[in-house]
Amino acid sequence: MKVIGITGTKGKTTSALMTAHILNKSGIPAGYIGTSGINYAGRTYPTVNTTPESLELQRIMREMADSGIRAVVMEVSSQGLYLGRVRGIDFDTVCFTNFSPDHIGGAEHPTLEHYAACKRKLFTDYGARCAVYNADDKMAEYMVGDFKGKRRISFSSSDAAANYLLTAAVPERSGCRLGVMGTVLHDGREYTADLPMPGAFNLMNALCAAGAAESLGVPADRSFAALADVTAAGRFQTVDALPGSGITFIVDYAHNGLALESALTVLRKYRPRRLICLFGSVGGRTELRRRELGEVASQLADFCILTSDNPDFEAPEKIIADIAASFKPGASCDYVRIPDRTEAVRYAVSIAREGDIVLLAGKGAEDFQLVNGVRVPYSDRDALLECAKATV
């Protein structure tokens, strides 16, 4: 069974889901392991960690192999590498999406350097045969510079020498649906990548996926054709909650300042009447993340709804207050505080009008809220559909 490992600060989930989608549509039965759970042979179930603990991971991979899966695409988190969860796995291909400050402090990484060094291990310590990497990222050379495998596949939006070069990205909007069409140069030939999800960064994820698929023998034309109907639950996922209303609802996992900035900047390109952002932040983590989320949303959204995320043992009101401290009267957008996330979603549905884009950020495809150490059933998508149904 071939094993593809994908690491990076952002884009792991979407790139991995895209890669598995391409392989499955190309006649290579593939499984997925990552933040969105475990998926193979028509089976889907959740996992606690992005990269499961060692014994659990080995059990899952054994089940996949016994079910006829020929390739597994796995998100490899920095914590997974730090704690040795993937030790003993023989990776065929390893991929690097990008790097930015995150997961520093608390129970995660003590320093940025430690965070980077853990990710780098995927390229130096696991004997992979091929490395696929984002040549635009300033940490690319650090990550893959000492890679000893036989093959490297690069992707870029600026480096003409890259194996996959994104030369154009055009936003597309049809009703409540958002997409993006890209032009890609590969091996002297031009390809079109037409994705049913917004954002040039998703085109970069698509290039990562195409490179990973190529490492297993899938040609580029087949990869880009397969991506025309790809979906990634909770990753810039359009939810048609109010059909015919002209309102676009997006559920996305953006949970730090950089990811939220990227999401809101992309959505601005679709020229919404108003850009409404509903978000919170997790408990038990650095307050820097809360400040960054507030700073970004207060400047890039037209209206914000501050609510709970996974508060755990912290009071949601305290987390919301930390976020709200970044909103400056006269210099920021207006906002409301609604600690109950379901009620916050209900409010978002009630104020949305034709032409608006409403972003529910932070939880993505998660099916729970972590409250006082307990996973309470909750889904942004389900809450959105239920609240919308009640308004009809």
Place the predicted regions along the sequence by residue.
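Short, flexible loop segments at boundaries between secondary-structure elements
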Residues: Y378-V392
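C-terminal helical cap/extension that packs against the catalytic core
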Residues: G246, G294-E354
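Short internal beta-strands
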Residues: C130-A135, I276-F279, D302-N310
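Charged helix-capping and loop-helix junction motifs
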Residues: E113-A117, E287-A297, I320-I323, V376-D380
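Nucleotide phosphate-binding/pyrophosphate-handling subdomain across enzymes
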Residues: H186-F303, A325
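Short glycine-rich anion-binding loops that position phosphate/pyrophosphate groups of nucleotides
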Residues: S78-Q79, S100-D102, D137-K138, P171, ...
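Extended acidic/charged loop-beta regions that coordinate divalent cations
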Residues: E63-A65, I69-I104, E141-T192, A225, ...
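Phosphate-binding loop of NTP-binding sites
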Residues: M1-A135, M139-K150, L207, R271
